[in-house]
């Protein structure tokens, strides 16, 4: 990290002296700045930062979602189910080897999945009933239920790690990694930087890989730069050629500058407002009060104030990039800002002037979002206080609806059914759903969408409409993701990952 600061300091001085875009060295290396570099290379990790763009570069998985949101085989050759998604037979490709020369077989796939179940770091592995080897290249996976997206999630979270290499590591791959990936991690400084180089002994022909992960760059250097202005300086001075998910306020400064290419994509989560379902909360059983709050929110003003105009409305509670989202919802009435309507609903509700509480994290944009919401609600005659808490408090209390009346959160997932299950399943926790609500009518609609035959447009619409009409949650806005690169690197044949963002390793360049 000290080395990086020294480089950035020199870059700042150079920028001050010359006041122009400095040329980046053409060394064949793609240098990328991102807000987080892993603190460990272990393949066993929780969901935090799971969607970081470098994970598909350092570890291959059994399957991968492409930009069309279709699951492609990767280490797996094929799979099939004969019982409607409860049990799968998965066949692996032949000849898979890790960078230490160890063969990756069904024994390793079974071991990795069993170890993931035991460590319980990702909830999806708790949905596995059993996993067993069939032969050297085949294993059987039995699920507790055939919920849509479960098998797909397991395939993308099960990595090409051999048991022999993992057990030979003194720190469980904390500081070095052996995997089946075409890239080897040749330099790693935890939470600072990571260098990846193409292996000469990779086990298969690169062109046979899924296009979204087939490498076109021989060497990639990831640098952690958390501070937005420093990320911008690194881009301008050629310390890096690309910055991914740079904060909007900094990223928009490069609009209209031909020296930089800007790509804006829909955020993969967005921000949501969840209403408490606990009986102690005034909002729990007061539909008109919840609807009044929704009508009091000026989404366009919120996007302008918080995302400088670089964002989009949410027409479901959750992000439009999730599988199952229907663009037709964008033509529906969904609590378009109407202050007079909000005031009318407040008068018709059971609200008696109580002070309602908003719980949010004290980090990032959350406190500002809460302040904007507070101002909107006060205009409608609703008193609000904000509890911007430490993350430890959020983790301990986010599911307890007695601790708040409203909770600001940002929920991800590959399928809409994922996000819906996380938040609205009345049987998910001992106290009910993610806000202590026990809405079993909604639960029955949810469960209809969980099975392969039930995941239909009609059933998905039923859940969407129920959430909209009941207003137990409300989609606030979805800020764009900014990815910016120096135009001189000559991006050609751009490849995208599932969320629509550039896949830097799989994209071709003429100017590195």
Model-flagged regions — what are they?
Residues 33-81, 114, 178:
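N-terminal lobe/hinge region of extracytoplasmic solute-binding protein
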Residues 77-121, 134, 140, 283-285:
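Aromatic- and charge-enriched surface segment that lines or borders ligand/interaction sites
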